Amino acid sequence: MVDERSTPCYCVTVANVATPTHPLTEMGFLSKKASTTINAGSSGGGYLSVSKLHDGGSVRFALLVAQPLEGYEAWGANVEGQSKPFRFDFEPTREDVIHELGEYEPREGRGGPGTVDVKFFIAAPVYNFDSGSVQVMSLTQKSIIKELDQISQMDDYDDLLAWDFNLSKKGAGLLTEYTLRPVPRKKGSQEHIDAAWIEARAAGFDISRLLTGGNPFKAA
């Protein structure tokens, strides 16, 4: 936690003088734009990548569906070194992964040579408050998935779609820790959330395309 130390302010009070405000700032030292730039993680394209949050960074989002897409995920790399995920709606064997990846080389699992790295995942469309748009959040981090599941089982949060969530990251590598916290819906945001979600669905959004390597936001 940052230790905020106050410093004395030597001021002269002038009556009836309006205080200028930063056009992008409601409160705080930094403008909204600067604060978002410093604190936000990667939200390029239509995906919210929580793993790319920097140490101390956070992101605020709202879930748009009551149930996520669930499955298993394996990553592979081709001869050019380009990597991409392959997803399954069942728990695949090593042979299943090798067959599905084709020319892509699967990542080695924790068991060493001869094993493949397969992880359980959930994915859901969310409204990212930083980008002001609908994005896909795909999670394999067990700690985040467990926290989300625990929150969903609390009586106070029986309707997860009525809440915002603040996800923060601390540390890096094997020492990474994530904290997920439900917070009240941001004032005045529901209209923007609804409009963005309606627009995404009208454009053909279908998250199940992740299972076939497609684009959830539009058909091929």
Regions found by a protein language model. Name each.
Residues 123, 164, 177:
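Beta-strand-rich binding-surface signature
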Residues 170-196:
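OB-fold/S1-family single-stranded nucleic acid-binding modules
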Residues 161-163, 192, 205-206:
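Glycine-rich loops and low-complexity Gly/Arg-rich segments
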Residues 2, 7-156, 203-219:
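OB-fold ssDNA-binding interfaces and closely related basic DNA-contact patches used
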Residues 160-173:
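Flexible glycine-rich surface loops and low-complexity tracts that mediate binding to linear polymers
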